[in-house]
Amino acid sequence: MSLISNNEERSLRVRYCIAIALSALLISGCTTLRLPNQSTSVYHQQTWAQRYYDLSRISQWNIDGAFSIQQPGKTIIAAYDWQQKGMNYRIRIHSSLDIYSVNISGRPGMVTLWRSPRQHYTASTPEQLMQQQLGWQLPLSNLYYWIRGIPAPGAYQADFDTYTHLIALQQSGWHIRFSQYTTVGSVDLPRTLQLSNGPLAVKIVLKHWQ
């Protein structure tokens, strides 16, 4: 008599396939996360209230960049493309040589991760979905705000530079550092974010803003 049910066997096969895919992502990724060349930016001097207002009005963007996740015994490096339209988004995560990729599409209350046209998974939050399917702890809901250089709704502690750029933030158990900004049109936007939460460290590079 088999000690593993059909459902358990199917679940093990799915997890095994995901593990293989993640291994491909790790092998094909770069060994270091390189920063884009520093462009010359003329920063805008504003009050924090005005800067927050301008940044909070940005609700559509196309971003491409790279990120790394460091946790005990494992380091993940990958590239990404993030398309945002209002509260709807589509994020493609892929290896440097495009050997492996996943697509995440979401709207409030519904997030789907696609590993192939026929293989997809759903959850109510992106954090839940990525933890279940990829084993990653990424505060994607809050990153919607943090990548614009503003806090997410809720309590926070923050530090600012002389231009009132957000340079350090503590929120929802995360410590975030904004080490570079770049001028895009009439606003200054982050280029690098460093996040930490206990033993977990995440670095996000935003190479191009549109």
From Swiss-Prot:
Q: Which superkingdom heads the taxonomic lineage of this protein's source?
A: Bacteria
- What does UniProt give as the signal peptide span? 1-29
Q: Where do we find S-diacylglycerol cysteine lipid attachment?
A: C30
Q: Give the UniProt subcellular location, in the record's own words.
A: Cell outer membrane
Q: Which UniProt keywords apply?
A: Cell outer membrane, Chaperone, Lipoprotein, Membrane, Palmitate, Protein transport, Signal, Transport
Keyword Lipoprotein, does the record have it? yes
Any single Gene Ontology cellular-component annotation = cell outer membrane
* InterPro entries per the UniProt record, alphabetical: LolA/LolB/LppX, OM_lipoprot_LolB
| The keyword Plastid is annotated on this UniProt entry | no
Give the residue numbers of the N-palmitoyl cysteine lipid attachment. Answer: C30
Output the Pfam families linked to this UniProt entry. LolB
Q: How does it sit in the membrane?
A: Lipid-anchor
Give GO BP annotations, semicolon-separated: lipoprotein localization to outer membrane; protein transport
Q: List, alphabetically, the CDD domains matched.
A: LolB
Query: Function of this protein?
Result: Plays a critical role in the incorporation of lipoproteins in the outer membrane after they are released by the LolA protein.
| Similarity comment text for this entry | Belongs to the LolB family.
Spell out the subunit comment. Answer: Monomer.
Q: What is this protein called?
A: Outer-membrane lipoprotein LolB
